[in-house]
């Protein structure tokens, strides 16, 4: 009898070993599958980036991709692409999952990782519950697509993951509020008195959404404004012909340029000041932004320059405007940021566009007031043309706990929810249905595979039954 018991125990141990081995292989297979395929989607998006330079081109790319994969899709009147996957028999009772991911031709490279995640989930959801993967259109991060999206996609029991690119990888149940501004003034022109004109340009920066890297991002518009102030304090007389940069107030500018006129007797002084400015700038930023260039070159003399009175007011205002970290709390946590995103001239008027993001309502109000005050002192027209409420949900909710559990199960690590200072699409989803479960996901390529695996694991862990063959 003892011998039989020993043999039975041996078979039990062997069976357990096979079971554990099978589970380990299953998890490893899922991880390997995700890593291989999500990187493939990322690579294809990167390789296609040179052709995806308009809303229509990206919309068609997504539509054709869904069609080629046999995924049901639709496109609404605002160029939102909605891919839909029905629940499998096993997951008929599972709550629906919604993936929301924006695309924007003005900052396409910053959307690639979340788009790759969303494409993977649409095609490889492991036969789980009802799934909608929604790609919302944007132009200069204006949220146009999500604002116009039909609320029918967000049910009371929907589990919504808002995917966004970011400097930091994190899961958030709170995201910041946003205000978008323009500051405009008319300028007068006169004929130049100097004999030499130079174009100064900073370019090759990645752009993107203002976020936690703002203190280390070299804003080219602000840098050129500071350069003009530097010239003034170092007794270099110049005349400003034009200055331009950026494509949207809601984004970091990728480049900026200006043309100034100087007296030919000041050429040596000008070149000396420029060499110093360029050397300091490159020392500070070139290592982190190797594609960036800072140049100047002689150009034909312009027919007109801004008058001295308007030039002084304009340069003073540009130098004074908020740009960068606005507030950190006592624990050095980032709370509020501001960014100058664009500057352009038209019909004798200059317009500067900027944005503020904050987790604090009082800070957001202070930023509004500060910008308004600066404009008032310089006789500049101030306008807050758009605003967005922050989003906050309970990090102790059953949904948040389930996502954290899926993260732990997939990666064998603990998740910590962190507040996201930049405003995100999560607040617009919340406006459409306050009963939906919503989490914001900020991701770059470092955690793309792990975060994809977390969402897939969460979906696999939803209510389901085994269906007999």
Place the predicted regions along the sequence by residue.
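C-terminal motif of bacterial Sec signal peptides marking the signal peptidase cleavage site
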Residues: 18-22
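Zn-dependent metallopeptidase/amidohydrolase metal-coordination segment
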Residues: 24-30, 329, 335-355, 401-465
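Acidic/His- and Gly-rich active-site-bordering loop/insert found
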Residues: 30-109
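Alpha-helical metal-binding/catalytic segments enriched in His/Glu/Asp
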Residues: 98-145, 181-183, 199-204, 211-231, ...
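His/Asp/Glu-rich mid-to-C-terminal helical/loop segments that flank catalytic regions of hydrolases
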Residues: 131, 216-234, 267, 310-328, ...
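Acidic-enriched catalytic cores of C-N bond-cleaving enzymes acting on peptides and small amides
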Residues: 191-195, 212-244, 250-251, 259-337
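Active-site-adjacent substrate-binding region
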Residues: 212-246, 377, 385, 392-433
């Amino acid at each position: 009898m003892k011998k039989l018991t020993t043999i039975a125990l041996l078979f039990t141990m062997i069976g357990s070993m096979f079971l554990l081995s099978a589970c380990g292989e299953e998890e490893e297979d899922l991880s390997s599958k995700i890593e291989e395929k999500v990187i493939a989607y990322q690579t294809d998006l990167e390789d296609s980036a040179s052709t995806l330079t308009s809303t229509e081109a990206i919309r068609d790319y997504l539509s054709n991709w869904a069609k080629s994969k046999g995924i049901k899709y639709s496109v609404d009147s605002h160029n939102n692409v909605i891919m839909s996957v029905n629940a499998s028999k096993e997951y008929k009772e599972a709550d629906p999952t919604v993936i929301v991911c924006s695309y924007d031709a003005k900052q396409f490279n910053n959307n690639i990782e979340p788009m790759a995640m969303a494409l993977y989930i649409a095609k490889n959801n492991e036969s789980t519950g009802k799934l909608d993967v929604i790609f919302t259109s944007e132009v200069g991060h204006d949220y146009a697509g999500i604002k116009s999206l039909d609320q029918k996609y967000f049910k009371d029991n929907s589990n919504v993951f808002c995917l966004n690119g970011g400097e930091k990888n994190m899961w958030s149940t709170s995201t910041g509020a946003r205000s978008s501004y323009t500051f405009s003034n008319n300028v007068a022109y006169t004929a130049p008195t100097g004999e030499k004109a130079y174009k100064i340009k900073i370019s090759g920066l990645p752009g993107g959404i203002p976020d936690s890297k703002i203190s280390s991002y070299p804003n080219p518009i602000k840098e050129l404004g500071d350069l003009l102030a530097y010239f003034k304090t170092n007794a270099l007389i110049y005349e400003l012909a034009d200055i331009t940069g950026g494509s949207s107030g809601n984004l970091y500018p990728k480049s900026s340029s200006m043309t100034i006129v100087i007296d030919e007797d000041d050429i040596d002084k000008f070149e000396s000041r420029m060499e110093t400015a360029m050397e300091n700038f490159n020392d500070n930023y070139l290592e982190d932004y190797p594609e960036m260039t800072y140049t100047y070159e002689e150009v034909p003399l312009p027919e007109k320059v801004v008058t001295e009175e308007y030039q002084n007011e304009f340069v003073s205002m540009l130098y004074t405007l908020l740009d960068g970290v606005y507030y950190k709390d006592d624990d050095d946590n980032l709370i509020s940021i501001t960014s100058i995103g664009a500057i352009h001239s038209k019909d004798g008027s200059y317009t500067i566009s900027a944005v503020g993001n904050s987790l604090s309502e009082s800070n957001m109000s202070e930023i509004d007031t500060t910008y308004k005050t600066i404009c008032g002192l310089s006789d500049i027209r101030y306008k807050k043309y758009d605003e967005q409420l922050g989003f906050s949900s309970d990090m102790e909710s059953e949904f948040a706990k389930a996502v954290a559990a899926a993260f732990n199960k997939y990666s064998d690590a603990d998740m910590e929810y962190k507040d996201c200072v930049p405003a995100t699409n999560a607040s617009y989803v919340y406006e459409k249905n306050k009963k939906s479960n919503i989490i914001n996901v900020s991701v770059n390529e470092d955690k793309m595979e792990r975060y994809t695996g977390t969402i897939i694991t969460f979906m696999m862990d939803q209510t389901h039954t085994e269906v007999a063959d």
